């Protein structure tokens, strides 16, 4: 059973490039170095919003154990870095999904 931890981010147009850079150059390499995820997917959310841009970051965990390690040790630390960089300009919510086999 694989678990997917999906975080959706919404930012103003002016800082979208900064968020993309931070996710690609810091967040994803940091997670990959920990060896917990079997796949990572970073995408633009296709919606017609009047303001801002939305992105989805999906971390796929091969086991519940790896997922729990991420949640307990790394989740708040990584999100904290993004909040420190973008402050109240960063809206986010997360959902945990279970793959149906």
Which positions does each model-derived feature cover?
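Glycine-rich beta-strand-turn "strand-cap" elements at beta-sheet edges
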Residues: 38-52, 80-101
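Surface-exposed beta-strand edges and their flanking turn/coil or helix-capping segments
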Residues: 18-22, 34, 54-57, 70-72, ...
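Short amphipathic alpha-helical segments
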Residues: 15-42, 77-81
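Short, well-ordered beta-strand segments in beta-rich or mixed alpha/beta enzyme
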Residues: 2-9, 42-73
């Amino acid at each position: 059973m694989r678990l997917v931890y999906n975080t959706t981010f919404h930012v103003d147009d002016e800082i979208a490039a900064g968020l993309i850079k931070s996710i690609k150059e810091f967040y994803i390499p940091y997670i990959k170095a920990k060896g917990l995820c079997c796949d990572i997917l970073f995408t633009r959310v296709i919606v017609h919003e009047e303001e801002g841009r939305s992105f989805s970051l999906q971390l796929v965990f091969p086991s519940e154990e790896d997922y729990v390690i991420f949640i307990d040790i790394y989740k708040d630390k990584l999100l904290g870095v993004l909040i420190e960089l973008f402050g109240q300009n960063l809206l986010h919510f997360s959902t945990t999904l279970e793959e149906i086999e």
